[in-house]
Structures are given as C-alpha cells and as structure tokens.
A protein has these predicted regions:
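Hydrophobic beta-strand-centered segment that forms part of the acyl-chain substrate-binding groove
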Residues: 53-88
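Generic structural detector for well-ordered beta-strands
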Residues: 12-18, 76, 120-122
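Catalytic strand-loop segment that frames the active site of acyl-thioester-processing enzymes
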Residues: 2-40
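A generic structural micro-feature
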Residues: 5-7, 67, 83, 97
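Short, conserved micro-motifs enriched in small and acidic residues
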Residues: 39-47
Length: 138
C-alpha cells in the first residue's frame, strides 16, 4: 500500500450497458429470470461498482501483488437502466482503516440517479490469499 492511498480519493468510470448485463443474463439457467425485464441487473451493477473501486485503488497499491477484495456493500438500486445507456459511476474513498477501505458510491444513467451507497474493500496479499483458497479445495 502506498502513502498516496488516502481518504478523499475520487474516481469516475463510465460504462455503456450491453444487453448481456441485463437481468435475464444474470443466471441464464434460471427460468424465472428469463421472464424479467432487460434492464441492468443489480448483481451486474454491484460488479460494476467493484470494478470502479478496483480501478480507483490500483495505482495506490502494489498491484498485482496487492489486490483488493469486496467485504461489504450497502446500496439502493433506485432506477432501471436499459441497454445502450451509459452508467456514470463516481466513487470516493471515505475511510482507510489499516487495510480496510470504505467508498461512497453514486451512479446515474444520464436520466436518473440509479444507485447510492457504500462499498467496503480489503487489501490482500494476492499470493497468500490464493494459497488459502487453494487449501480450501483440498
């Protein structure tokens, strides 16, 4: 972790929603989801927020030896976004507590605010983390 990783860090990311990030594609094997509207799925939205936070942090850690993993999410999904619209995600690093990072998140699709919330990540040593995961497979 570098000294530049401090509260107040902001980052913005834009992402055009493709059809394969809509609700029916979240779990293609789930027949119930196949009947749902083709709008950005909350699960994919969470992934987009994680991706944005990763991009925000990576210049400030020893990537790829250090990485961050999600440990908490608290958000509202406020409006539906159809494919073709661009989601603008703005994150702000609110707190650095050792290796724990807390971000505030606001996202819009150019028409509506689609989400507000917080996301927590934890800085890991990638080699040690991957070794522990491999041990679970044994």
């Amino acid at each position: 972790m570098k000294d530049s990783l401090k509260p107040g860090l902001t980052y913005q990311f834009k992402y055009e929603v493709p059809e394969d990030k809509t609700v029916p594609f979240l779990y293609p094997e789930a027949p119930e989801l196949q009947q749902m509207p083709k709008v950005l799925a909350t699960g994919f939205m969470v992934g987009l927020f994680e991706w944005t936070c990763i991009q925000a942090v990576n210049p400030h850690i020893d990537w790829p030896d250090e990485q961050t993993v999600g440990i908490g999410i608290n958000l509202n999904h406020l409006a539906a976004t159809p494919p073709g619209l661009t989601v603008n995600v703005e994150v702000k690093l609110e707190e650095v507590d050792g290796r724990r990072l807390v971000f505030s998140i606001v996202a819009d699709d150019g028409i509506d605010t689609i989400s507000k919330g917080t996301h927590e990540r934890f800085i890991i040593d990638a080699a040690k983390f991957n070794a522990r995961v491999a041990d679970k497979r044994k």
